[in-house]
């Protein structure tokens, strides 16, 4: 195996290359990282959010001696900078599986919050309530993220990601944006006012839309991990699934173009000013026909540019039907394209209410519009509270009531989510990681893990390296590790 050349450390040594069997096709690894916001209301005295987050993670620390751990479903659970609980899904081959793992993260966070709430009430009163927000901006204006991860063939240059993919990522927010009420009006995205660069390797001193730090968590000679920052955290299951699914198809077209030296159809889509275009798209409802300036000097609306991407992807699919069909185990290409076409048609008609059962911003807009009709004197602060309730996965009621009244589509059942809480995807290396973590916990062994390593730290150190994220079959090193564990 080659040396793993991640940024920061490129210290994984091995003896021979292990090329992935999936390098030549369109199969992909998907992942979603979600940072959650934490707040407390009803306490008899002030409670620090960091203290609440640590209380939530106390069961994790007791079990793993750390606030950074991997779970039996292969996912990562940890406290991020600023006391934001974060959940990173296990590697998935299909958007539907990635959605299940993301919802499992909601389930885990909700359980941690409700257990911590019971403990908190012993010291802060019976009405102390923990809120865990799956959103991207808090009431003080601090932004935090939802990051998508896509494994991309390394022969695609980063410049192409910026020029051909980024315009798609910006304009897909027409149907994947979570929406946000601001003092100046309603925006269809949460983070447009906070993202200031197109691409960058930094995430602290700048806020890029795509992060280029080279950490593939795979064979670095074959793949790069595309780290998308621009997306919102979604409550809608459809939106989470859709943003992964359509982005996969666009990436397939880009990869195929570079593989064969042919045009992708996206060569002339780059924005002259991506940050300005992003802010304009976020204010789509102010002017749905607002023109965005391309590098070429041409102007096009956000919807018009999405139509171009749709047409190019449709033409690409017609000549790659079988290869694309085999790239996704649980999602059909016809389903993705049908949903994409219908949502673009609804946007063109201005039929935003027709999207309210699947698009977060449309659902929230319908709620706000109905509230303003009933109560013309409603204040911004009251609408802000309503919005926070929509995103509260611990004690919020609004989103659940929409689901209960069949006003929000669900793609997965409660049983699907419960299964994903305890079980990793079976067709990626997450299956091996989950098996190892489960066995180590059962015998009380000291261990550590990351995306490419599994380590037994005592009584003697043993390690297995899992460099291929597509490979779910045990390696010799993994089998030896499990023997030592047992």
Swiss-Prot record:
Please name the catalytic residues of this protein: 80 (proton acceptor)
Record keywords: ATP-binding, Ligase, Magnesium, Metal-binding, Nucleotide-binding, Ubl conjugation pathway
Sequence positions that bind Mg(2+) = 33, 78, 86
Keyword hit for Nucleotide-binding: yes
Q: Give me the reactions it catalyses.
A: ATP + [prokaryotic ubiquitin-like protein]-L-glutamate + [protein]-L-lysine = ADP + phosphate + N(6)-([prokaryotic ubiquitin-like protein]-gamma-L-glutamyl)-[protein]-L-lysine
Q: Quick one: which residues bind ATP?
A: 76, 89, 451
Against InterPro entries, the record matches this protein to: Pup_ligase (IPR022279), Pup_ligase/deamidase (IPR004347)
Q: Name one Pfam family in it.
A: Pup_ligase
Task: Report a single Gene Ontology molecular function.
Answer: ATP binding
**A biological process from GO:** proteasomal protein catabolic process
- Class of the enzyme per the UniProt entry, highest EC level: ligase
Q: Known EC number(s)?
A: 6.3.1.19
Pathway listed: Protein degradation; proteasomal Pup-dependent pathway; Protein modification; protein pupylation
Further information: The reaction mechanism probably proceeds via the activation of Pup by phosphorylation of its C-terminal glutamate, which is then subject to nucleophilic attack by the substrate lysine, resulting in an isopeptide bond and the release of phosphate as a good leaving group.
Function of the molecule: Catalyzes the covalent attachment of the prokaryotic ubiquitin-like protein modifier Pup to the proteasomal substrate proteins, thereby targeting them for proteasomal degradation. This tagging system is termed pupylation. The ligation reaction involves the side-chain carboxylate of the C-terminal glutamate of Pup and the side-chain amino group of a substrate lysine.
List, alphabetically, the HAMAP family matched. Answer: Pup_ligase
Family, according to the entry, reads as follows: Belongs to the Pup ligase/Pup deamidase family. Pup-conjugating enzyme subfamily.
Name used for this protein in its record: Pup--protein ligase
């Amino acid at each position: 195996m080659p040396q793993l050349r991640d940024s920061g450390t490129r210290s994984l040594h091995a003896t021979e290359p292990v090329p992935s069997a999936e390098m030549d096709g369109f199969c992909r690894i998907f992942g979603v990282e979600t940072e959650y916001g934490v707040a407390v209301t009803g306490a008899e005295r002030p409670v620090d959010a960091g203290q609440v987050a640590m209380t939530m993670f106390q069961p994790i620390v007791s079990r793993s001696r750390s606030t950074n751990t991997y779970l039996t479903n292969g996912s990562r659970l940890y406290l991020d900078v600023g006391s934001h609980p974060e959940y990173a899904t296990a590697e998935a081959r299909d958007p539907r599986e990635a959605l299940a793992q993301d919802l499992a993260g909601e389930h885990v966070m909700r359980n941690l919050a409700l257990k911590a709430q019971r403990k908190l009430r012993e010291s802060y009163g019976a009405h102390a309530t923990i809120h865990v927000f799956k959103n991207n901006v808090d009431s003080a204006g601090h932004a935090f993220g939802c990051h998508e991860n896509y494994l991309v063939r390394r022969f695609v240059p980063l410049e192409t990601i910026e020029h051909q993919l980024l315009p798609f990522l910006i304009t897909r927010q027409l149907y994947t944006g979570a929406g946000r009420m601001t003092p100046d009006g309603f925006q269809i995205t949460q983070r447009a006012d906070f993202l200031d660069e197109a691409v960058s390797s930094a995430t602290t001193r700048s806020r890029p839309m795509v992060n280029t730090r080279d950490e593939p968590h795979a064979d670095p000679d074959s793949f790069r991990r595309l780290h998308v920052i621009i997306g919102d955290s979604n409550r809608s299951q459809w939106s989470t699934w859709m943003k992964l699914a359509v982005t996969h198809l666009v990436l397939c077209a880009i990869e195929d173009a570079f593989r064969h030296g042919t045009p992708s159809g996206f060569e002339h889509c780059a924005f002259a000013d991506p940050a300005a275009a992003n802010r304009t798209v976020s204010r789509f409802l102010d002017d749905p026909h607002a023109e965005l300036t391309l590098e070429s000097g041409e102007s096009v609306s956000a919807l018009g540019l999405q139509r171009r991407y749709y047409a190019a992807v449709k033409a690409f699919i017609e000549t790659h039907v079988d290869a694309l069909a085999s790239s996704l185990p649980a999602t059909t290409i016809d389903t993705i394209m049908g949903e994409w076409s219908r949502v673009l048609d609804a946007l063109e008609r201005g039929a935003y209410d027709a999207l309210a059962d699947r698009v977060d911003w449309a659902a929230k807009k319908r709620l706000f519009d109905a509230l303003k009709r009933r109560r013309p004197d409603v204040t911004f602060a009251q609408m802000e509270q309503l919005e926070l309730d929509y995103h509260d996965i611990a004690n919020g009621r609004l989103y659940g009531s929409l689901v209960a009244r069949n006003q929000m589509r669900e793609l997965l059942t409660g049983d699907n989510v419960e299964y994903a809480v305890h079980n990793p995807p079976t067709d990626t290396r997450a299956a091996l990681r989950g098996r190892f973590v489960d066995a180590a916990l059962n015998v009380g062994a000291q261990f550590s893990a990351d995306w490419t390593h599994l380590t037994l730290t005592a009584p003697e150190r043993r390690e297995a390296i899992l460099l291929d994220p597509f490979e779910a079959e045990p390696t010799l090193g993994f089998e030896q590790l499990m023997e030592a564990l047992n």
